[in-house]
């Protein structure tokens, strides 16, 4: 069965002085290969199978399997503390906003809409046949009137709720700008007739003052952004739309004398056509005017569907043939001020039908530069004048017709739809979605679940090795050796009664007189005689255990011959937690701790009183107790719970005795309960029963002792790391009965009189004494039962003694070095 069975002594333990100096049986730990044989070991011994790391506990003649050593897994559980970080995962809820970010992608399409403002170059109007240059006449009174004031830009209309973008429709006739607000009314623009042959230049009129540019209208508030509609598929290129409706023909101006044509200014708003001036003499051929610069092509916008072809404009009225004037002096070719660029938002009138070529007027002399009359809307092409000198070829300013690029403005209207696209930038909210990534951190919190794995570490009943702690009790004898140090004090008795002054001798430690105390060491001879007992008288000195000054008495450690349990104490013991005040408690596992040894008691049962004359009450029962129960612990974790209070003794007949309350210890998912003892009876002379414990071990705890019934209470029992409480003794007329015992602790005594029963003992204290005719019942201690009350107690007191309060003690150890 078990081979190479070795007795193990060197395990790290501490000699623990428990509240009442409990001396436990000398448990042993055996280590071998395979299951233990029933012939080895005694009750409460432990056996560890090296092959399987299983732990057995001997109970009676049987070895009970209690668990396995799994300490290593327990260390993995330490990581569970990181689980706290998981709380941040809640921030991840914001990540849902990321979906809105996709709408932002549509917004980028809207930016292309801005390019739409430039649009495709409007289809250039069909250039009319170049008319024969007429004879340059006197510059007519083609007064370029002051530029009409630019209509104020209408306030931008509130953007309507953006509807779902429909499929792109065909380009319709340019209409007034819709949702972007009503444009200010523009002066009537004459429809542009087809370019005819250039008539004689009239006298250059004085350049009219530049019209005041209207103030831009207030921008309307943006409307509520509608959801972006589905982008329509790009339509097929439609057939070229008809020219737009012909604009209203401006009033025909009088023909002015042809002057030298000045450089074409930028095309301004077309004014009223001036009247033809009298034909002047044909002037000298003017220098060929500088061709106007070709306007730069606008950025190519997304090609929109071609609009429906506008109706062909009516043919312009053929202009009257101008009289050929004398060639005027060459007019100043000063380039006119650049006219304000026409508002591109307005619909361009369709190009009128090509007018008949006007007759060339006779070239008259260049007249004085006339005042620039208001530029009338381009009138009907006059009759083709006589062919003038080639030089009369006007500046290609007619190319100013390229101002038709203003049609791009029409495309702009389309482009403004692109502005709606800007709202798509709202998709930036999608960036918030990135903060949603923080939610991933929340996933880290799952690691906290590993902390549960740490509970597996609790299985690491490796601490069971702590049974050697029982052995440590032997070390308690070493504590008795401390009494031996008192014997050293007894050595000072060699000096006689002055030994009491030995307290002042402590002062002598500061003085050289303390050296005389060294002579006291010779008093070790006192070990031989009962002089040491006199040292017990020195217990008075205990009052001033200053005798501890005789720490030199540590020499008495020699009495610790069996102090093998002390080995490793200084190396592995960290600290102890102890509380005996009833109520809640919290103990935090210190740094470095790996093992904890739990000792605890519940509240003892209260002693019974009397109800009828000549009767006394039974003693209360003792509580269940834990003793050095080993646990695997983790630094920073906590033991919490409640310490039980002793039950109240009975008071006369009005209030019966009560049961002691339980002591509850919680650690992680584990719960340990030391149940309180039962109260003594006040009516039937019965003692209260002792109680037991509840713990998460695969064994049944020993039952509590039974209260006496005209007998002494029965003793408590023991099981793995626990003791049950003893029963209280019964009361009697001629003599009461004693409470039961637990280990070295005895039940409360009674007396051969009408007396209450003695309280049952606990594993840590004696039971309370029963009351009689000369003494009152006493309280129990450390979970033992209170004594029963008696009718004939002094002053007529009949109260039973209270049960002893419980306590909790936890000793923490590190890994042995």
Curated annotation (Swiss-Prot):
Q: Which UniProt keywords apply?
A: Collagen, Glycoprotein, Hydroxylation, Repeat, Virion
Report whether Endoplasmic reticulum shows up as a keyword of the record: no
Task: Briefly state the modifications made to the protein after translation.
Answer: May be hydroxylated on lysine by the viral-encoded procollagen-lysine,2-oxoglutarate 5-dioxygenase.
- Is the Glycoprotein keyword given for this protein? yes
Alphabetical GO CC annotations of the entry are: virion component
Q: Where is the composition biased (Gly residues)?
A: 757-771
For the Collagen-like domain, which residue ranges apply?
83-142, 145-264, 268-327, 352-411, 430-489, 512-570
Extract the PANTHER family matched here: COLLAGEN ALPHA-1(XXV) CHAIN, SI:CH211-266K2.1
What is the protein name stated in its UniProt record?
Answer: Collagen-like protein 4
Record the organism. Answer: Acanthamoeba polyphaga mimivirus (APMV)
């Amino acid at each position: 069965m078990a081979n190479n069975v070795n007795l193990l002594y060197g395990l790290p333990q501490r000699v623990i002085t428990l509240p009442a100096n409990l001396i436990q049986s000398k448990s042993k730990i055996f280590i071998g290969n395979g299951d233990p044989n029933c012939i080895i070991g005694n009750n409460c011994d432990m056996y560890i199978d090296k092959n399987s790391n299983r732990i057995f506990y001997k109970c009676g003649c049987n070895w009970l399997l209690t668990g396995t050593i799994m300490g290593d897994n327990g260390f993995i559980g330490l990581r569970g503390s990181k689980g706290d970080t998981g709380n941040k995962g809640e921030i991840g809820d914001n990540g849902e906003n990321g979906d809105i970010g996709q709408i932002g992608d549509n917004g980028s399409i809207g930016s292309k809409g801005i390019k739409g403002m430039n649009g495709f170059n409007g289809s250039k109007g069909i250039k009319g046949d170049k008319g024969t240059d007429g004879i340059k006449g006197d510059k007519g009174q083609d007064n370029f009137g002051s530029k009409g004031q630019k209509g104020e830009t209408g306030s931008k209309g509130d953007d309507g709720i953006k509807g779902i973008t429909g499929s792109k429709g065909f380009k319709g006739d340019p209409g007034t700008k819709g949702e972007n607000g009503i444009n200010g009314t523009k002066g009537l623009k004459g429809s542009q007739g087809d370019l005819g042959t250039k008539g004689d230049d009239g006298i250059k009129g004085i350049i009219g003052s530049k019209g005041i540019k209207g103030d831009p209208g207030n921008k309307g508030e943006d409307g509520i952004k509608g959801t972006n509609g589905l982008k329509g598929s790009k339509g097929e290129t439609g057939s070229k739309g008809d020219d737009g409706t012909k604009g209203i023909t401006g009033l025909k101006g009088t023909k002015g004398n042809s002057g030298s044509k000045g450089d074409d200014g930028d095309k301004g708003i077309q004014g009223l056509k001036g009247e033809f001036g009298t034909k002047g003499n044909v002037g000298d051929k003017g220098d060929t005017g500088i061709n106007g610069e070709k306007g730069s092509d606008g950025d190519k916008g997304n090609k929109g569907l071609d609009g429906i072809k506008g109706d062909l404009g009516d043919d312009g009225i053929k202009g009257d043939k101008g009289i050929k004037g004398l060639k005027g002096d060459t007019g100043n070719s000063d380039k006119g001020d650049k006219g304000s660029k026409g508002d591109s938002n307005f619909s361009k009138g369709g190009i009128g039908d090509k007018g008949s070529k006007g007759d060339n007027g006779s070239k008259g002399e260049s007249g004085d530069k006339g005042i620039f009359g208001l530029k009338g809307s381009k009138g009907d092409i006059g009759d083709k004048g006589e062919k003038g000198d080639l030089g009369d070829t006007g500046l290609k300013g007619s190319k100013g017709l390229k101002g038709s690029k203003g049609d791009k403005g029409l495309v702009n209207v389309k482009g403004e739809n692109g502005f709606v696209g800007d709202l798509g930038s709202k998709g930036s909210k999608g960036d918030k979605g990135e903060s949603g990534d923080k939610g991933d951190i929340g996933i880290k919190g799952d690691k906290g679940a590993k902390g549960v794995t740490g509970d597996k570490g609790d299985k690491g009943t490796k601490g069971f090795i702590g049974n050697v702690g029982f052995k440590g009790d032997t070390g308690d004898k070493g504590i008795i050796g401390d009494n031996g140090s008192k014997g050293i004090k007894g050595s000072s008795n060699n000096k006689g009664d002055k030994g009491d002054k030995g307290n002042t001798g402590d002062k002598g430690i500061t003085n050289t007189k303390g050296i005389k105390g060294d002579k006291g060491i010779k008093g070790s001879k006192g070990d031989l005689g009962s002089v040491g007992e006199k040292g017990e008288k020195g217990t008075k000195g205990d009052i001033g255990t200053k005798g501890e000054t005789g720490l030199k008495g540590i020499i008495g450690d020699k009495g610790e011959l069996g102090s093998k349990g002390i080995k490793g104490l200084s190396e592995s013991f960290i600290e102890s937690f102890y509380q005996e005040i009833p109520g809640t408690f919290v103990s935090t596992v210190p740094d470095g701790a790996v093992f904890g040894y739990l000792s605890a008691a519940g509240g003892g049962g209260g002693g019974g009183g009397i109800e009828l004359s000549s009767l006394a009450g039974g003693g209360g029962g003792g509580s269940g107790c834990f003793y050095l129960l080993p646990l695997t612990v983790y630094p920073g974790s906590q033991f919490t719970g409640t310490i039980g209070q002793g039950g109240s003794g009975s008071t006369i007949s009005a209030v019966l005795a009560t049961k002691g309350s339980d002591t509850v210890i919680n650690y992680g998912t584990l719960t340990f309960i030391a149940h309180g003892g039962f109260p003594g009876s006040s009516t039937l002379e019965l003692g209260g029963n002792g109680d037991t414990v509840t713990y998460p071990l695969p064994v049944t705890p020993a039952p509590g002792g039974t209260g006496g019934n005209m007998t002494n209470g029965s003793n408590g029992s023991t099981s793995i790391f626990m003791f049950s409480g003893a029963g209280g003794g019964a009361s009697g007329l001629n003599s009461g009965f004693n409470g039961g015992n637990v280990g070295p602790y005895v039940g409360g005594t009674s007396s051969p009189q009408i007396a209450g029963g003695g309280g049952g003992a606990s594993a840590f204290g004696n039971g309370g004494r029963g009351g009689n005719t000369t003494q009152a019942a006493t309280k129990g201690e450390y979970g033992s039962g209170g004594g029963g009350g008696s009718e004939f107690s002094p002053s007529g007191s009949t109260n039973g003694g209270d049960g002893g309060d419980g306590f909790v003690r936890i000793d923490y150890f590190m890994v042995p070095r």
